[in-house]
Structure formats: C-alpha cells, structure tokens
From Swiss-Prot:
Name of the molecule in the record: Transmembrane protein 18
Segments in the Perinuclear space topological domain: 1-25, 74-91
Residues exposed to the Nuclear side: 47-52, 113-140
Organism of provenance: Homo sapiens
GO cellular component terms given for this protein: cytoplasm; nuclear membrane
Pfam families: TMEM18
Lineage start: Eukaryota, Metazoa, Chordata, Craniata, Vertebrata
First and last residue of the signal peptide: none
Length: 140
C-alpha cells in the first residue's frame, strides 16, 4: 500500500509517482475510464471531421485548464482522495491527467497529417490522369 503523500515530500520522478499512487481509489479508476473513453472517441471520430475537431479542442482546453484543476484539487483533496497527490509543481496531474490527453491530441494530429498526405496523393494522381488524358487527345 502506498504511503501518504505530502506536498513537501512528493516524488519528483515519473516512476516514483506511478508506483506510489493508490490506483484503487475510485476517482483514479474514474479518471482511467475517462481516458479510455477519450481514446475510444479518438478512434471512432476518425470518419467525422467535425467531431474530431471538437474532441481535439476539448482535449487541448482540458490540458490548458490542468493548472486550475490542480489548484482546486489541492484545496479539496480530502473530499475525494485518501492522499494529497496534488503538488505545487503539478507533477501528478501532468502525468495522470495531461499526458494521456496530449497523447490523444497527438494521435489526432497524426491522423490529420495522414489524411492530408492521402488527399495530396489522390490529387496528384488525378492531375496526372488528367494530364495523360489531354496528351492522348492531342495525339488523336
């Protein structure tokens, strides 16, 4: 069982944070479920551009608000947690909240780049076909 955290003795390394966190706490399981649903939405939204843009913007806004969420959680941690995980440096919230959201956002950006490359390839192929058609008409 992990020891109780205090803000002054909060671990500074990622492995220490991950190993000293009590992952059985209901709010952390809820957060893990939230991240799983975000990944699912990222995968399912690949065919709906508007949904994907909205999802991406929500992810970025949540990451932007992480500092404020950390401050609120640091003041009210007794209401939902056994331990004080929320330090002033924001290490914990960065690892368990922001990092997965940023990974999701990066996946969306990679999907956009992939789609853009495919469209550019299709466009170039269409241009080549049109060019070839014109060349054949001139020969006839």
């Amino acid at each position: 069982m992990p020891s109780a955290f205090s803000v002054s003795s909060f671990p500074v390394s990622i492995p220490a944070v991950l190993t000293q966190t009590d992952w059985t706490e209901p709010w952390l399981m809820g957060l893990a479920t939230f991240h799983a649903l975000c990944v699912l939405l990222t995968c399912l939204s690949s065919r709906s551009y508007r949904l994907q843009i909205g999802h991406f913007l929500c992810l970025v806004i949540l990451v932007y608000c992480a500092e404020y969420i950390n401050e609120a959680a640091a003041m009210n941690w007794r209401l939902f947690s056994k331990y004080q995980y929320f330090d002033s440096r924001g290490m914990f919230i960065s690892i368990v909240f922001s990092a997965p959201l940023l990974v999701n956002a990066m996946i969306i950006v990679v999907m956009w780049v992939w789609k853009t490359l495919n469209v550019m390839t299709d466009l170039k192929n269409a241009q080549e076909r049109r060019k070839e058609k014109k060349r054949r008409r001139k020969e006839d």
